[in-house]
């Protein structure tokens, strides 16, 4: 009787979301749907961003493009890494044992998310320097220093999470879709505090400090410009139109950055601290907060890139190039279509 019961339990796959399991399909349906959906979204979104940067050379003239492309590649690798738990949930055999697979997956995703988060902080620092020191900006921020900064971001992110292989504790809940990670690999309060103090807290403080000061400086500049325009209009006797306040645009960017960052990451960080300090875990909470934070891999480049008019033009060129290639292929297959001798407009990628 006991052996039969054990056999029935062992036939059921391990599911963090127990209510997502269906007997008919014999896998964790809800987990698979969520992870596969986010994987497709992250991969496709960041591939588009990378292609647009290759399609619009003007984007590469901006220093922030170095960090945005770093974010795009890091987030793309996050999406590719998420294929591993997707295949595991669909009962595909793992190349190595489950314990090593989930440790490597948790470490890789943690490092990639750290690179993405550090790039966000570096973008805010770059914009802060551009506004506070516009005359010396080109001498302070050089391509060589940007490449060095990106290298240090990857190195620092790797070093922060490397102790997870030396029994310091679990770096996060990314690998908890594997049973060994969820049940046998536990968090440590000291290692969790170390990660928060070395990564999450500094990144949040830098973003808040820099964008708050950017907003304040731009608001002061707008006020000065409005006063000068009013003084000039009163002296000339003409009522000139006051230009639209540019601080509104900065306020919206500030709102998007801070709100998305905290909405997606704060629940994960809070649960990470509470679970490691109290020892009480909740599988539903860990899954929800973890994949909510991972979804930021899709939001990062969307927030920064879609706010750029040059990026939007590059996206139009990319879509135009795809339509042109489809049209030219259709024309080549149709012998009755008159072919134009002029060059095709589009983006050569």
From Swiss-Prot:
GO terms for cellular component: plasma membrane. Its main location: membrane. Glycans are attached at residues 2, 8. Residues 1-32, 97-104, 169-191, 274-283 are extracellular. Pfam families: 7tm_1. GO terms for biological process: G protein-coupled receptor signaling pathway; glucose homeostasis; insulin receptor signaling pathway; negative regulation of insulin receptor signaling pathway; positive regulation of multicellular organism growth. It comes from the Eukaryota. The gene is GPR21. Residues 54-75, 126-147, 213-252, 305-349 are cytoplasmic. InterPro entries: GPCR_Rhodpsn (IPR000276), GPCR_Rhodpsn_7TM (IPR017452), TAAR (IPR050569). This is Probable G-protein coupled receptor 21. It is found in: Cell membrane. Not detected in the brain regions thalamus, putamen, caudate, frontal cortex, pons, hypothalamus, hippocampus. GO terms for molecular function: G protein-coupled receptor activity. Orphan receptor. It is a multi-pass membrane protein. Belongs to the G-protein coupled receptor 1 family. Signal peptide: none annotated. The chain crosses the membrane at residues 33-53, 76-96, 105-125, 148-168, 192-212, 253-273, 284-304. PROSITE patterns: G_PROTEIN_RECEP_F1_1, G_PROTEIN_RECEP_F1_2. The keyword Secreted does not apply. Keywords: Cell membrane, G-protein coupled receptor, Glycoprotein, Membrane, Receptor, Transducer, Transmembrane, Transmembrane helix. Gene3D superfamilies: Rhodopsin 7-helix transmembrane proteins.
